[in-house]
């Protein structure tokens, strides 16, 4: 393998794993943890409040390892994934390395569309300092390229053509 920056940025041997899936049943409602979800190219996550509203932000993902970092920054033992308002928690793969790339989770193919920046709700959900603790740890947004079922334990891999 070449050591050019382009080659290094396109080589992601790690495989991640889906640790948690959450759906928002209504605006400002708590996320509901589920074992599996159907994902559609046009609608995004079925039964999610944001379903069909934004093609660039159909799915939000965050790293389990970042939840652990945020918890430490806030002096907490753990952070409940639903407090971050993200749909999917994954572990074992650097989501930032997936920027501008397509990746596969189970049957589903997603494409990163940007960073998922924290909002003011983080102060409300995580407590004082929650917004700043989440900065740089908010995960990514993605659009759906190929729909299907996504479930707990599914592997997360860079899509190779």
PLM segments and residue spans:
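Metal-cofactor-dependent catalytic cores
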Residues: 1-161
């Amino acid at each position: 393998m070449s050591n050019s920056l382009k080659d290094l940025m396109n080589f992601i041997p790690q495989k991640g794993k889906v640790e948690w899936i959450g759906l928002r049943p209504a605006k400002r409602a708590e996320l509901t943890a589920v074992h599996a979800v159907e994902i559609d190219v046009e609608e995004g996550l079925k039964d999610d409040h944001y379903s069909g509203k934004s093609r660039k932000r159909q799915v939000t993902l965050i790293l389990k390892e970042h939840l652990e970092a945020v918890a430490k920054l806030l002096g907490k033992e753990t952070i409940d994934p639903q407090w971050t308002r993200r749909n999917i928690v994954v572990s074992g793969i650097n989501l930032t390395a997936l920027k501008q790339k397509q990746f596969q989770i189970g049957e589903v193919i997603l494409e990163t569309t940007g960073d998922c920046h924290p909002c003011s709700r983080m102060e409300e959900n995580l407590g004082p300092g929650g917004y700043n603790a989440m900065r740089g740890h908010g995960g990514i947004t993605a659009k759906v390229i190929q729909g299907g079922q996504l479930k707990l334990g599914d592997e997360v891999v860079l899509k190779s053509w």
